[in-house]
Amino acid sequence: LAWKIAQSPKIEKLYIAPGNAGTSAVGENVAIKATDFPALKAFALEHKIDMIVVGPEDPLVQGIFDFFKEDAATRHIAVIGPSAKGAQLEGSKEFAKEFMLRHHIPTARYKSVTAATLEEGLAFLETLTAPYVLKADGLCAGKGVLILPTLEEARKELKEMLSGMFGDASATVVIEEFLSGIECSVFVLSDGEHYKVLPVAKDYKRIGEGDKGLNTGGMGSVTPVPFADEVFMEKVRKRIIEPTINLSLIH
């Protein structure tokens, strides 16, 4: 994000909080955590910041957009990112699944499970075929999804996740039907009414060679994606993006 934003002729100065060795080459790193909203506010006011582009999920789920918009001193600053409520689509897999069902957006068959409903979860696993998909409900930096080859492993890992494997993030676990096929990430900017689709990417999350092993936050990605042609993207727009933003009710 910093590398691309820095290329804009409209940018006079770019700060990255907290930044890293790579971002220091394109802007000025600032030693402020992305979730330290009061410190970010003070910095933004002192340096007359016009726009904040939020990258990570954590500050969005914790309400950075709302924090700046609800404060008279900072509401003039453009914050690129959803409200805390909107960020729940990423912050809670259970919320996202319920949202998709409610708005008739295609998604895999699933069941949400807690420690109190473990037996129901184990019974649901019996109705699925391998491999088995377990997802921690909350944020785990991209590591909260397990894909298990056998029912025995799925049962064992479900119990461990509900016992605190990912802390509070796995107090609820979403068991999901495995969908085989190609995968890509579609990025969309929206003001809540209009939208713009950004370049599509294919993310490679598995830690091992040959796309094997546990998921990470991402080992690398490639763009453009050859299979994301116009026919494919039209399906994505009509079946996923527009129902999500509710454009179908506007046009």
Task: Label each residue range with its predicted role.
Residues L60-Q62, G121, E183-C184:
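Short, well-ordered alpha-helical microsegments
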